[in-house]
From Swiss-Prot:
SUPFAM superfamilies: P-loop containing nucleoside triphosphate hydrolases. The keyword Nucleotide-binding applies. Belongs to the GPN-loop GTPase family. GO terms for molecular function: GTP binding; GTPase activity. A motif (Gly-Pro-Asn (GPN)-loop) lies at residues 76-78. Keywords: Acetylation, GTP-binding, Hydrolase, Nucleotide-binding. The modification N-acetylalanine is found at A2. Pfam families: ATP_bind_1 (PF03029). Heterodimers with GPN1 or GPN3. Binds to RNA polymerase II (RNAPII). CDD domains: GPN2 (cd17871). The record marks N78 as: Stabilizes the phosphate intermediate. This is GPN-loop GTPase 2. Small GTPase required for proper localization of RNA polymerase II and III (RNAPII and RNAPIII). May act at an RNAP assembly step prior to nuclear import.
Amino acid sequence: MAGAAPTTAFGQAVIGPPGSGKTTYCLGMSEFLRALGRRVAVVNLDPANEGLPYECAVDVGELVGLGDVMDALQLGPNGGLLYCMEYLEANLDWLRAKLDPLRGHYFLFDCPGQVELCTHHGALRSIFSQMTQWDLRLTAVHLVDSHYCTDPAKFISVLCTSLATMLHVELPHVNLLSKMDLIEHYGKLAFNLDYYTEVLDLSYLLDHLASDPFFRHYRQLNEKLVQLIEDYSLVSFIPLNIQDKESIQQVLQAVDKANGYCFGVQEQRSLEAMMSAAMGADFHFSSTLGLQEKYLAPSEQSVEQEAMQL
């Protein structure tokens, strides 16, 4: 007698601003998962995505096309994309009919890059909420470009956006600093990498901003934003280079812990293996240190020395 098809499915909702590397992440992660023996289905939820580099199991473009919407309704790219997401929200039976035959696969959802969809517009959140009711356990994987760390003002903005996304999307959440191999192409980091990944004492960033004549006028605003971020104490990041298998493994370990895949029934796992997967994501200092040595130029001063000079 054949076993029943699994009812619970797992996956990642890959979100983030345009250019953060979502599609490249889906390609790299899908190849990595297949190498581990997982059956993977990549679902494109971005109607603006063209020339996809990965094999697409489900494409929202079959339901609604961004170009057609823009022409028919005389909308711009942003307005057209919002309409497409609202149209998908109103036709979730189409999406479920596409996903149900793929039960037993691990899903990667390549989502649109418009920030408002993840910070205050309700369509994408409603779609995710409905999928969880279909017993699809998702982790939101939020990518932001790592080069924002080189600019204190932009990093504070990234922290605010990440926090707003975490509160709005309402899914288990993993934040990634993508393109780690390019992190210092736009300037040197003021602090060690773990300062940014663990979001340590942000008062140091305020001191750096105070040295800029433009941002000195906005010190009180920046202080309030920093206080808000620290009061919630939710945001942290995992550094990612999608070309580095060890880096992908660290991300996957955190995602598996967040959506419960490491405790799933599809694979036989010993208690030791499950505890290793569950706990390992919390102790990645050595991995972060290794990435710093690999991608960042040696710093001549410590954080404490720099702080004393401010």
